[in-house]
């Protein structure tokens, strides 16, 4: 097998969700990536190219295959076999959108292999059906920052192309599974709490749309929907929040269900904050990230395109 036999590659950014009170609605792309290199093959095979994805299922029990197969079946198409090399620096089960990136990549994979000619709206809805909510998937698909709502028959998003901030991620080395993070949430909220949560979330979105990140950071601290309950699973949260506030950051929030903690800070100050937080949290990976404006990208092998002419 050589590079000339490669059909195409798929690159998908990771993501964060919620930013505090934007629960299951606000998503933002992050500069960690999943890349699939797709080759002709007689049977389905997945091989890991980085330590991050070492141990992934190598056959049809792989999540990427399963989502691609469901996508092809939905359009009554046969999914031809391929060898997929998987490269990723998105850590698994850390709240950085690894599963959403895999789902988006799988839908792109089915679209390319089966010639489905899916629109971005189609891809978004299919990914949201898989995820149950649009935040991570929409950010990985479209890039930038998104606010969305998923319903069974339709998925709606509004995209903010430019998030003019730096992001520093504090990534603990332990995992928090989404189902465990869901289990600690209350089954219901008192009405007055729901009203306050709605107001805080509304103001968060208004601040984001106005590029008022200082106000957005204040609203991130006022979340009452999930972070107060999930804090018990991530003991670093309050410590990172305090340290970041002392360094002049806009705001701090759990990334998705955690355990990664995101700190938003003025553009150009991310690397300095990364160094400072590294001193305080030596037991965590501290990464300076950006918000890519571009989402998933397909690169086709020009030699394969010539063959198909």
Swiss-Prot record:
Membrane spanning segments where? none
Q: Origin, by domain of life?
A: Bacteria
- Alphabetically ordered keywords of this record: Amino-acid biosynthesis, ATP-binding, Cytoplasm, Kinase, Nucleotide-binding, Threonine biosynthesis, Transferase
**InterPro entries associated with the record:** GHMP_kinase_C_dom, GHMP_kinase_C_sf, GHMP_kinase_N_dom, GHMP_knse_ATP-bd_CS, Homoserine_kinase, Ribosomal_Su5_D2-typ_SF, Ribsml_uS5_D2-typ_fold_subgr
The GO terms this record gives for MF are: ATP binding; homoserine kinase activity
SUPFAM superfamilies in alphabetical order: GHMP Kinase, C-terminal domain, Ribosomal protein S5 domain 2-like
The entry's function note states: Catalyzes the ATP-dependent phosphorylation of L-homoserine to L-homoserine phosphate.
Q: What is this protein called?
A: Homoserine kinase
Q: Which organism is the protein's source?
A: Bacillus velezensis (strain DSM 23117 / BGSC 10A6 / LMG 26770 / FZB42)
